[in-house]
């Protein structure tokens, strides 16, 4: 690993830590030439996944788009960044275990939905209201009743 300060290749790892979800490794490094310290983050490279949209279009899977939708659903909720990252990692791990290279958007939505239901019910309702394209208050009331009954189907 080259030093970002002096471009020397003479660096060594001082400390390594696995993330909570074991999907990445954070390494603290020291440059032997200029004595600068810097941190690197090693993450699992996902296989290329295509998303099949409702209208039949295909687009490459965008991890940032998924993270943004989860962040919007959990906005101003008592959910930490660590919890959000854990949910994201679970979802990405699930994608890695799928044999297909094309995943329907519907399947992605269901996986996110199920993870948010466990994490925070309000975030779940927010996500589902967009995902299911709710049109009026009755849709919300119906979903809340299903959650109270313990069934989200």
Curated annotation (Swiss-Prot):
PROSITE patterns: ATP_CONE. One of its GO terms (biological process) is negative regulation of DNA-templated transcription. Residues 11-20 have a biased composition (Basic and acidic residues). Its cofactor is Zn(2+). Residues 1-20 are annotated as: Disordered. One of its GO terms (molecular function) is DNA binding. A zinc finger (unnamed) spans 3-34. Keywords: ATP-binding, DNA-binding, Metal-binding, Nucleotide-binding, Repressor, Transcription, Transcription regulation, Zinc, Zinc-finger. It holds the Pfam family Zn_ribbon_NrdR. Residues 49-139 form the ATP-cone domain. Binds 1 zinc ion. Belongs to the NrdR family. Negatively regulates transcription of bacterial ribonucleotide reductase nrd genes and operons by binding to NrdR-boxes. HAMAP family: NrdR. This is Transcriptional repressor NrdR. The lineage of its organism: Bacteria, Pseudomonadati, Pseudomonadota, Alphaproteobacteria, Rickettsiales. The gene is nrdR.
């Amino acid at each position: 690993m080259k030093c970002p300060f002096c471009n020397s290749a003479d660096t060594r790892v001082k400390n390594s830590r696995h993330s909570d979800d074991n999907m990445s490794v954070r390494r603290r490094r020291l440059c032997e030439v200029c004595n600068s310290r810097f941190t690197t983050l090693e993450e699992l490279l996902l296989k290329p996944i295509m998303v099949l949209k409702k209208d039949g279009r295909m687009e490459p899977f965008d991890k940032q788009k998924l993270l943004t939708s989860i962040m919007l659903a959990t906005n101003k909720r008592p959910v930490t960044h660590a919890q959000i990252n854990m949910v994201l990692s679970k979802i990405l791990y699930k994608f890695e275990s799928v044999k297909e290279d094309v995943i329907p958007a519907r399947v992605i939505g269901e996986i996110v939905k199920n993870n948010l239901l466990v994490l925070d019910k309000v975030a779940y309702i927010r996500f589902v209201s967009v995902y299911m394209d709710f049109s009026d208050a009755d849709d919300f009331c119906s979903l809340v009743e299903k959650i109270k009954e313990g069934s989200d189907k």
